[in-house]
Amino acid sequence: MSALKMDEEQSLNVYMQEFRTRFINRSSEEVTSQALKESYKDSAQTDAWFKKYRDGELMIEKVLEFRNEITLQNKRIEEKQKNILQEAAKQGEHEQIKEELTERIQRLREELNKKREVALANRKANKERIKELQKSATLFRERLGLEIRKLRGDKLQFVFRCINPKDLDQPYSCIISLNAEGEYEVTGCDPPLECIAEFQEKVRETRNFSALLANLRKSFTALGSQVK
């Protein structure tokens, strides 16, 4: 009778241990899955909007990164050179050691020079790219009458001008954002547009953002032509 009781207790302990292991594994998988979903959602909301309109800022950041990298490399070269010279002093005047240390210093200098050349070339290319982006922004603002404003909550406001022939500075605006599912949402049109739901559905199907802006401008233009 005592042996049977011990067997039952052992079976119960084994079952509880297996249940505990399955529970921990399942909880870990759920936490990991939820973290991946949140990570994907944040990435989709970020990448979908600023790929085109932050090119200029990214180029400037890269120039600063190259500059900081060169400064950091200079410090590292100086530290390594100092350490190498200290090693040479400890080892005395042995010619072979001095030659090896000199070669190491020379290689470090050549490496630094190559990085400087790459950084200068990238800075020059980035400056040209920034000029092109500035020209494009000027074209949008002055000729096409489109201004883009960043709002809170990862929203962008598109302000169209040069629509009303009687008042070219009159703004026609619309707010565009991404919802939790990564779909476009078009809201806050001023003045209101009756066809906004149709435009929103179409851009969700085609993902053609340029066509959405073109349709919004056409609708605002048609609305502006009715004003007397």
UniProtKB/Swiss-Prot annotation:
Top-level taxon: Eukaryota
Pfam families listed in its UniProt record: Spindle_Spc25
InterPro entries, A to Z: Spc25, Spc25_C
Presence of keyword Cell division: yes
Coiled coil start-end: 61-144
Keywords: Cell cycle, Cell division, Centromere, Chromosome, Coiled coil, Kinetochore, Mitosis, Nucleus
UniProt KW Ribonucleoprotein keyword: no
CDD domains: RWD_Spc25
Compartments where found: Nucleus; Chromosome, Centromere, Kinetochore
Reported function: Acts as a component of the essential kinetochore-associated NDC80 complex, which is required for chromosome segregation and spindle checkpoint activity. Required for kinetochore integrity and the organization of stable microtubule binding sites in the outer plate of the kinetochore. The NDC80 complex synergistically enhances the affinity of the SKA1 complex for microtubules and may allow the NDC80 complex to track depolymerizing microtubules.
Matching PANTHER family: KINETOCHORE PROTEIN SPC25, KINETOCHORE PROTEIN SPC25-RELATED
Protein family per UniProt: Belongs to the SPC25 family.
Subunit structure: Component of the NDC80 complex, which is composed of ndc80, cdca1, spbc24 and spbc25. The NDC80 complex interacts with mis12 and zwint.
Designated name of the protein: Kinetochore protein Spc25
Species for this entry: Xenopus tropicalis (Western clawed frog)
